[in-house]
Structure formats: C-alpha cells, structure tokens
Amino acid sequence: MLTKWDELMCHQLPATMDQVHTDSPEWTERIYVSIYNVRAQDTIFGFGVGQYPNKNVQDGFATVWHRGRQYNFRASRTLRPCVDEVRIGPLSVELLEGLKRFRLKLDENPSSLRIDVEWTATMNPHEEEHDFRESGGRVVQDISRFDQAGRARGILEFGSQSITLDEESWWGHRDRSWGTRRPLRTDATDTRRRPLLHFCSAGRSRSFVTMRSIGVSSNVARANIPI
C-alpha cells in the first residue's frame, strides 16, 4: 500500500515502502531507549517500540523503576494502514532531527505512567557489525544495528510522583535495529527462564498490561488496554 514514505527517493525494492525483502514473520524493526539518573542513581526509565510488517503488528512499552518499585505500560495495534507513524494509542515516538533528537511520549492511559521526554545525542551513532547467522542452511538472524549515547530532559509521572528530567543528571543510550532475528519464546512451562526486566515483574511491581511472568511467582496487576 502507498504511504507518504513512497514520496522519498530511497526505495530499494520494486515495491511500496511498507514491504520488506522477505516474507519471514521474524522480520522486525525496533527502537529501544534506556535513560537513568546518574546523580541520585534511584531511577531507570525504559521505552521501546517494535514493528513487524509480516505480522501486521506494531507494539511498544514504557517502564519506570524507582527505588525498588517498577511501573509498566504495554500496548499493540494492527500496523496497516498507519504504517508511516510510530504511535500505539497513547504511546508515540516523534523524530525531531535524524540521528540526533527525538521525543518520547505516553499520554493519558489507564496506568499511572505519563511521559514527555526529549532525547538528544551526545555522540555520533555507532554502526555495529552486521549480524548474520545460519542454522541448518536456514537464515535465523540477519540484523543491522546502531547505538548512540545521549541525554534527556522532560517529565516522568508514575504513581503519585512527578520527576523533572534535566540533561545534567539524566543520561542514557538508544539501540536501533532492523532485520530478521531469532524468535523470542515465552513458554510458561519453561521455568528455567528468568523474567525480562522490562516485560515481567514481581514483588511490589505494578503493571497495567496483560503479560505473563515466567519462572517466578508474581504479584502483578493486569488490565487490557484496547488500541
């Protein structure tokens, strides 16, 4: 399908820009940002978006860990027809300046999390070596990636608290990747696996999404968020 991206002079396939070079369901494009308070060292903020054109899905999350308590938000939507924007309900990423600045937002939603943060690079992006792997003659990983350090300013709200971020105290990094990757599995019967920090939680953590904790007993609140 045609999108505004098809006006750009950067096609690399005889197809519209919403299509990729393979029909593999594991073809994925991701944005991941991690920001932390280097002064107080008591708060970590994570934000991510994934796009899966061959599954017709875009999803995202935001999470804040503050003094032993974690707050989570996750959402997903059908990708098409809105393939030319990074927005899943109240969660969005706005590019302000290529390879330099972007804005992360989480507007009004059923969780206690609210976010409006601008991230600015403090170094040039580092392009990692291409990651290509085969198994049994089949491509299982074929990924390009770059990462970059930066600083952040803006507002974080969670629970009953509001924190103002300034670039002197809030540093972080981002990871940008695209390509075919190994599938992530979340088989609840496999108790050998440990929960991921940004997707599973335990103890006093609060979550406002439907998710599954793996290998731990969890005291997690759940609520579906229709997008």
Predicted regions and their residues:
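Structured soluble/peripheral alpha/beta segments that form catalytic or ligand/cofactor-binding pockets
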Residues: 1-227
